[in-house]
From Swiss-Prot:
<feature type="binding site">
    <location>
        <position position="102"/>
    </location>
    <ligand>
        <name>S-adenosyl-L-methionine</name>
    </ligand>
</feature>
<keyword id="KW-0963">Cytoplasm</keyword>
<dbReference type="Pfam" id="PF00398">
    <property type="entry name" value="RrnaAD"/>
</dbReference>
<comment type="similarity">
    <text>Belongs to the class I-like SAM-binding methyltransferase superfamily. rRNA adenine N(6)-methyltransferase family. RsmA subfamily.</text>
</comment>
<feature type="binding site">
    <location>
        <position position="77"/>
    </location>
    <ligand>
        <name>S-adenosyl-L-methionine</name>
    </ligand>
</feature>
<keyword id="KW-0949">S-adenosyl-L-methionine</keyword>
<dbReference type="GO" id="GO:0005829">
    <property type="term" value="C:cytosol"/>
</dbReference>
<keyword id="KW-0698">rRNA processing</keyword>
<keyword id="KW-0489">Methyltransferase</keyword>
<dbReference type="InterPro" id="IPR011530">
    <property type="entry name" value="rRNA_adenine_dimethylase"/>
</dbReference>
<dbReference type="InterPro" id="IPR020598">
    <property type="entry name" value="rRNA_Ade_methylase_Trfase_N"/>
</dbReference>
<feature type="binding site">
    <location>
        <position position="56"/>
    </location>
    <ligand>
        <name>S-adenosyl-L-methionine</name>
    </ligand>
</feature>
<dbReference type="InterPro" id="IPR029063">
    <property type="entry name" value="SAM-dependent_MTases_sf"/>
</dbReference>
<dbReference type="GO" id="GO:0052908">
    <property type="term" value="F:16S rRNA (adenine(1518)-N(6)/adenine(1519)-N(6))-dimethyltransferase activity"/>
</dbReference>
<dbReference type="GO" id="GO:0003723">
    <property type="term" value="F:RNA binding"/>
</dbReference>
<keyword id="KW-0694">RNA-binding</keyword>
<dbReference type="InterPro" id="IPR020596">
    <property type="entry name" value="rRNA_Ade_Mease_Trfase_CS"/>
</dbReference>
Length: 295
């Protein structure tokens, strides 16, 4: 039998050995196709001069592939039941450390400084993310300013479509903007549901996020910028005016003045949020921020 973890036979053997039962609440689906693992590490551009943070190693299938190609790997695992399994399956790799904990509550920057022997090496984040925590984890990693050159995630295809979307498409929304503001997003390849154990209900995709040197647009207040983008998509079929007036009631008595000012910078409030690109949202939020401060 192959020693690689990512095969149906080896995965079944490991699970039986430890009497492991999947927890639906943790969205556990383990990869059983080593070709997919190779494609993930190729997409992430992992080399021996790269440190890697992995989130959710499971029984270690992707971790094993990362250990073979990276300098060091630090893996966050929330499920304590998996720790003895990982000790076993990864025992041959001295360049892997497993941290028991929830990455959403962790000080990842501190972990990087303390756990890697050479923290100065380029850092990449790689993960097979369960659907229920995909967005919170990605946004935490972005907003905590983790010094990662890139992030490569396997996630539900629908979410990958939203992250990599372009304006005027049904997948484009506030999540697209929240991520593409900081990162270039590429949907690398589709992963069929048949390569997981247990098999999920939907296909997955691998998305590669590469950090921009500067955010995609200049904004006066990032927090307000994201507040405006979220408000603009609150009800997708409504116009910018309807959504923004609902979020910021102080705009209502000054509609004519607002319309005139936004028309002057090329933004029509009868448009829907999905038609604006990120630089246009930056112009909109910068104008609105100043407008709302006026007496």
């Amino acid at each position: 039998m192959s020693k690689d973890i990512a095969t149906p036979g080896r995965t079944t053997e490991i699970l039986k050995k430890y009497g492991f039962l999947f927890k639906k609440s943790l969205g556990q689906n383990f990869l059983i196709d080593s070709n997919i693992l190779t494609r993930i590490t190729d997409t992430a551009e992992i080399t021996k001069e790269t440190n890697v943070i992995e989130i959710g190693p499971g029984i270690g299938a992707l971790t094993e592939q990362l250990a073979k190609t990276a300098n060091e790997v630090v893996a966050f695992e929330i499920d304590q039941r998996l720790l003895p399994i990982l000790d076993d399956t990864l025992s041959a790799y001295s360049n892997v450390q497993v941290v028991h904990g929830d990455v959403l509550k962790a000080d990842v920057e501190e972990v990087v400084a303390e756990q890697f022997a050479k923290p100065e090496l380029p850092l990449k984040i790689v993960a097979n993310l369960p659907y229920y925590v995909t967005t919170p984890i990605i946004l935490k990693l972005l907003h905590d300013n983790i010094p990662a050159d890139s992030m490569t995630f396997m996630l539900q295809k629908e979410v990958a479509d939203r992250i990599s979307a372009v304006p005027s498409t049904k997948s484009y929304g506030s999540l697209t903007i929240a991520i593409q503001f900081y990162m270039e997003a590429e949907l690398a390849f589709i992963v069929p549901k048949t390569v997981f154990m247990p098999q999920p209900n939907v296909d997955s995709a691998v998305i590669h996020l590469k950090r921009r040197k500067e955010p995609l647009a200049e904004v006066n207040d990032e927090e307000f910028f994201f507040e405006v983008t979220r408000a603009s998509f609150a009800q997708r079929r409504k116009t910018l005016w309807n959504n923004l007036a609902s979020k910021f009631p102080a705009l209502k008595p000054r509609k004519d003045e607002l319309v005139e000012g936004l028309n002057a910078i090329g933004i029509d409030l009868i448009r829907r949020g999905e038609t604006l690109d990120i630089p246009e949202f930056a112009k909109l939020s910068n104008f609105l921020g100043d407008f709302l401060k006026e007496k």
